[in-house]
């Protein structure tokens, strides 16, 4: 952590950031939302620049002319140095700065917005602190708990900053088309949805090990309960298998395909009415999340949704046929090929037009052109369904 900042002191500030008074405090500028820099480019600070933070988010924002990356932050020195070099190479200069502590990004007055690509246990706390600092927020999915989703939703509403969840599926043609067909009745009355998500990984327990040079483990843990450093749990994506940091494959992959399902049945701001299920939880292992699972959801309109481990597919079944994508982003199949050819008049179409990528949607939102398509309410509703499962 930054010099002089003890873990206990940091946790006190973290609790304060998520407390009720924080929800009603205006942003520092006193405006309804954060200001945009005079250059007319949205200036960005990146928090978390691991594999997804650079390979997906940083790479995408560097290609948007209206965005400008000013700083990168990561608790791993090698990652932030690599990301800084990536930014400087893209812009042909050496202007990008880097830091270990994300609060240095929030304190930088020339940064309009932050892009958060950290483990899940940091998502909401960083988003809340950024919003209260007057920064617009692009943050990866999901939340860690149901309560966090409520805090996120209320904080963004109170501060007036723009928020975009980092989920791309609503701008992926395959999943947008599935939702469009189902919402417009191409399958008749919807009866059942089948979703298959990856199984959880099982990692054995490890002995405590020396913290590697150039890695701030205390800041990586942040608001999570203290535990000694072991290599695997801090590895890229491997932390997803520990409940202190994530909800496992269910909340990782479910954030994609379960969102498509909820959109298809008009429940993006709703949720299930009944939930039942079972899972297999490893014993005497580092992994604490379910390695195998099967969950039964009931939604309004007598729609059953079954989510189980074992793949990456989604299938809708209705009174007039079925529609599926058998694996991640695979082409659609249907019981009748004519289902795939259905056309809906614009004035009658019950599905919104396909939006730009989540990155462009965020920039458009900050510039006041549109409301970003994945709001705090969306991520709260989706995450709630996953957490309850």
Each language-model region and where it sits:
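N-terminal glycine-/serine-/threonine-rich beta1-alpha1-beta2 phosphate-ribose binding loop
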Residues: 2-139, 144, 150-163
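Non-transmembrane alpha-helical segments in soluble domains
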Residues: 11, 84, 103-106, 115, ...
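C-terminal helical cap and adjacent loop that interface with cofactors, partners, or active-site loops
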Residues: 14-17, 55-57, 246-270, 292-294, ...
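Tryptophan-centric aromatic hotspots in well-structured domains and transmembrane helices
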Residues: 30, 80, 120-122, 129, ...
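NAD(P)-dependent dehydrogenases' Rossmann-like dinucleotide-binding region
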Residues: 48, 186-204, 216-230, 273-282, ...
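Secondary-structure transition/capping motifs at alpha-helix termini
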Residues: 64, 130, 155-161, 184-188, ...
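A contiguous active-site-proximal alpha/beta segment in oxidoreductase catalytic domains
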Residues: 136, 143-219
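Rossmann-like dinucleotide-binding domain that binds NAD(P)(H)
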Residues: 218-301
């Amino acid at each position: 952590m930054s010099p002089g900042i003890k873990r206990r002191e940091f946790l006190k500030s973290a609790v304060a950031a998520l407390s009720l008074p924080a929800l009603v405090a205006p942003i520092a500028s006193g405006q309804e939302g954060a200001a945009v820099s005079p250059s007319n480019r949205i200036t960005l600070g990146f928090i978390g620049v691991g594999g997804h933070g650079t390979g997906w988010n940083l790479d995408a924002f560097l290609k948007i002319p209206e965005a400008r990356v000013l700083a990168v932050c990561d608790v791993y020195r090698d990652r932030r140095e690599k990301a800084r070099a990536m930014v400087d190479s893209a812009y042909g200069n050496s202007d990008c700065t880097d830091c270990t502590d994300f609060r240095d990004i929030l304190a930088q007055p020339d940064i309009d917005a932050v892009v958060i690509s950290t483990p899940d246990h940091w998502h909401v706390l960083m988003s809340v602190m950024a919003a209260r600092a007057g920064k617009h927020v692009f943050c990866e999915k999901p939340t860690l708990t149901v309560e966090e989703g409520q805090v996120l939703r209320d904080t963004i509403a109170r501060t007036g900053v723009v928020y975009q969840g980092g989920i791309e599926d609503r701008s992926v043609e395959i999943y947008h088309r599935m939702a469009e067909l189902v919402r417009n009745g191409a399958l008749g009355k919807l009866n059942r949805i089948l979703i298959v998500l990856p199984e959880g990984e099982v990692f054995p327990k490890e002995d405590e090990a020396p913290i590697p040079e150039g890695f701030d483990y205390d800041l990586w843990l942040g608001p999570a309960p203290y535990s000694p450093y072991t290599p695997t749990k801090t590895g890229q994506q491997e932390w997803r298998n520990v409940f202190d940091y994530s909800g496992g494959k269910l909340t990782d992959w479910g954030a994609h395909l379960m969102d498509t399902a909820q959109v298809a049945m008009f429940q993006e701001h709703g949720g299930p009415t009944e939930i039942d299920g079972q899972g297999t939880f490893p014993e005497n292992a580092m992994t604490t999340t379910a390695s195998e699972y099967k969950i039964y959801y009931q939604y309004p309109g007598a729609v059953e949704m079954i989510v189980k481990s074992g793949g990456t597919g989604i299938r809708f079944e209705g009174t007039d046929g079925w529609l599926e994508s058998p694996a991640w982003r695979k082409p659609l199949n249907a019981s009748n090929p004519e289902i795939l050819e259905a056309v809906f008049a614009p004035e009658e179409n019950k599905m919104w037009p396909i939006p730009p990528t989540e990155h462009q949607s965020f920039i458009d939102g900050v510039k006041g052109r549109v409301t970003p398509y994945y709001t705090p309410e969306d991520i709260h509703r989706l995450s709630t369904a996953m957490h309850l499962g």
